[in-house]
């Protein structure tokens, strides 16, 4: 593996990377592909660390295992799924980069949503990336507010003047809500609802979501 560093960055975002290639490889044109991994040097925050440990503890309490055992098992599973893009060492929650910990956080949240693991506070309060959380809830068909079984909710009410069988779903703003919170949103309005539950709104409906909910287009 060759390692290099960014030596220049233009206003249009073009980066110049300098790496030392062994002369024999260069002369025989043996370097055919280049994989660039932009290393995130931002350290994780104390808030991120606390959130991860809280998620781990919730899983540990639910499974009857120890928190340390659960943490190491999930770190190993997370690493195994990303072995092609991560280093050869298991990361540590004491000094891992911010972006990696955020991805691990989403990994834990996905497990909790899939297996209905109870948490002391609403799950959305344990995440930094609300948009990613909203998408995970859609994929797992869980209410973004309470975690109960949910259905697809169009933020811009399809039922008002639109034929649901003819509407273009792809790209529309959606989120998953249980019947109770679906009704509440329509009662109090989008702005008040999102503020109350600290949500940023829906996410664009893509083909993955369309397939899950049986939408034709």
PLM regions with names:
Residues 128-155, 180:
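Short cysteine-rich loop/turn motifs with clustered Cys
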Residues 121-133, 156-164:
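Short Cys/His-rich Zn2+-coordinating modules
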Residues 1-35, 40-43:
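Generic N-terminal amphipathic/basic segments
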Residues 174-195:
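Short Cys/His-centered divalent metal-binding micro-motifs
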Residues 173-180, 204-217:
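Short Fe-S-cluster ligation motifs
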Residues 25-81:
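The feature represents the first ordered module of a protein
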Residues 70-121:
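Charged, alpha-helical interface segments at or near domain boundaries
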Residues 142-174, 190-191:
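Histidine-centered nuclease catalytic patch
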